[in-house]
Amino acid sequence: MSFTEHPLRRWAVDEMRLRRFAPVAAHSEIYQVVRLIEADERNAEDRWLINARPDFDDWALAPRHGSGHTLGGIHFLWERHTEASTLTLIFPQETPEPARHNYIQWLENWPGGVVRATQIRIMPSAENIDAELSAIGISTDEMVCCDINAGIRLWSDFSIHGDGYGRLLITAGDLGEGERGRIIQRVQELGNYRNLALLGFPVVQQYGPQLDQLEHRLSDHARRVALADEDEEIALLFDGS
């Protein structure tokens, strides 16, 4: 390796490593929530994950990730990061509303504070885009549209709606369910990690000026020590000013 690697680089890569996403059908809906889980909430999360879950026909659980699947096509994904957990539900479009209810309630009552919550609707084509935008509640006044890959196009107003969710509307594109899922996963990871990173900004804004003052005082003190003679230097070393 010809360059010096930051000691935290490997940790950051492992933290952001994309676990395989579930397949996403061309006409489906996704609910994803990222929650900040405090250390004293981890046991509550484990109990909720194991004991409160709705019915799944297939269920697999490891220390940092888990998944569930029903014969009706509902997928659940859970991934534990260092400070947060990502929860994902994927519903086929034909899933009746009563069948969705228990799964969504389970997701919404999860322990921890919500950092990001997104409702994603995948549609086969953009043929009825105006009606779809209206149905999902995306404001055309604030809307952004972009092409991603292989015919996948995304619309969003990047705002939090009355139910607490952001909204994404995505065309299915010309690719398989597995690759579509991986692309949607990558798009979501960008927003999820951005929100997690921004959580530190208020602390920086609050304590940044104090750190600047301390830095100036330390610099001034070092300058005075450098210019002082031996007796003055000893006095300055014990000077708290």
Model-derived regions: residue spans:
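N-terminal pre-transmembrane cytosolic regions of membrane proteins
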Residues: 1-125
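Extended alpha-helical interaction modules
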Residues: 79, 89-239
